[in-house]
Structure formats: structure tokens, C-alpha cells
A protein has these predicted regions:
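Acidic, low-complexity proline/glycine-rich segments
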Residues: 1-9, 149-158
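Alpha-helical bundle segments that constitute or directly flank the non-heme di-iron/ferroxidase center
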Residues: 2, 16-44, 111-123, 188
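Helix-loop segments that flank and shape redox-cofactor active sites
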Residues: 7-20, 34-55, 103
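Active-site-proximal alpha-helical scaffolds that flank and shape metal-associated catalytic sites
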Residues: 50-155, 178, 182, 200, ...
Length: 209
């Protein structure tokens, strides 16, 4: 529940997310996007049809998600120098290190990880559709559109089918699922020491404005 109802997500969905926070998030998530996990997943896929499905989705990400990042980083005047100089947040580093640690793990563990990640994105994007809300900020609407719709629902459905086929609640992949939920939650919001949630990107804002 917390992973899809963070402050960041809620404010993105209702168009109250500060531009400086979104700008910092785009930098962090694009760095995260380039972690190579899809390539590892395709390599381990047990059937050719599964490899083909994953490869097609990887190309879709390149054509749509990467294009989204590039467009809005440019729209928010993020230079290549600024992008390269921005260090990952602690939560991003932790998440990336965990995904790197999965590189030599089994197919069930990897497919569970990607399924959990994508399912969470669909779940929070679906919140805005269920509420019949359309974002007016182009970057907000674009991000929701990428993660809600017939194509993305089918993608997540295919992943769930693969998890049901290859994974077990008694296997190590169960811990992978729990860990991904925890890391996704940390990626979007970190609790403040004395009260309300704060964004994990807040420490970067002074460098981005």
C-alpha cells in the first residue's frame, strides 16, 4: 500500500508536485533506467517466445520511456554536464546495488523483481484512472500515460503469468518480491526524522535550481 501511495506519487497525480522535485526525480530515475536489467532478463529467459516478448518490450521502453526522459530533461533545461554530475540518492544507490546483486541469480528471482517493479508502477498509475483524473502538467500526464493503458497492462499481465509459471512462494524469489517493494518505497519517499515524509530528492534541489 505505501509503495503506491507515497507523497511523491500523490502529488504527481494531482499536479501539485513541485517542478524542482520532478526535475530531480527525472535525473535519478533515468540513471536507474539505464541499469541493464532487461538485458540480463532476456538472456536467462527459458523460451524463445519469452525472449522475443521481453526484447519487444525492451524496444518499447527505448522508443517511449527513454524518449520521455530525454524530452522532459531537455524541457527542464537539464544539461548533460548537470546530469552526469548528479550523484544517485542513497535510496537509488541501494536499489541499484541490490539489482546488481541479482545479476547472477536465477530466472525466477529476476522475473519476480521486474514483475514487482512494473506491477507497482501500474498500480499507482491506475489510481489516477480510477479517480477519473487527467493531469494538466505534460510531464505528469506523460508519466502516467506510460504506466497505464492497454499496452502496459498487457506487459504486466505477461509478467504475472511468468511469475505464476516459474516462481514459488517458498523459493528465494519471495524475498526478492518483499525487498523490491521496500526499495521502491524508499526510492520515492524517505521518512523525515521528526514528522512528515520528505522527498529523497530534496538534498539535490539546491544543485538543480
Amino acid at each position: 500500500y505505501d509503495a503506491i501511495n507515497s507523497r511523491f506519487v500523490s502529488e504527481l497525480l494531482d499536479d501539485t508536485l513541485p517542478e524542482s522535485i520532478l526535475k530531480a526525480y527525472l535525473i535519478q530515475d533515468f540513471k536507474f533506467y539505464n541499469n541493464g536489467m532487461m538485458a540480463r532478463l532476456i538472456k536467462l529467459a527459458p523460451r524463445q517466445e519469452t525472449k522475443d516478448m521481453l526484447a519487444a518490450q525492451s524496444q518499447w521502453f527505448a522508443d517511449n520511456e527513454a524518449t520521455y526522459f530525454e524530452h522532459f530533461l531537455e524541457a527542464y533545461h537539464v544539461s548533460q554536464e548537470e546530469y552526469d554530475a548528479t550523484e544517485p540518492t542513497p535510496a537509488n544507490k541501494e536499489y541499484g546495488a541490490y539489482l546488481d546483486s541479482l545479476s547472477d541469480k536465477s530466472w525466477p528471482e529476476l522475473i519476480t523483481a521486474i514483475c514487482c517493479m512494473e506491477w507497482l508502477y501500474l498500480a499507482w498509475a491506475k489510481r489516477t484512472v480510477d479517480a477519473d483524473v487527467i493531469q494538466q502538467v505534460p510531464a505528469h500526464k506523460g508519466w502516467v500515460d506510460l504506466h497505464e493503458g492497454a499496452h502496459f497492462r498487457k506487459w504486466v499481465g505477461d509478467l504475472i503469468s511468468l511469475v505464476n509459471e516459474y516462481c514459488s512462494i517458498d523459493g528465494p524469489e519471495a524475498e526478492v518480491f518483499r525487498t523490491i517493494v521496500h526499495l521502491e518505497r524508499r526510492f520515492f519517499d524517505l521518512p523525515g526524522e521528526d514528522g512528515p515524509e520528505t522527498y529523497p530528492y530534496s538534498t539535490l534541489i539546491s544543485d538543480l535550481t
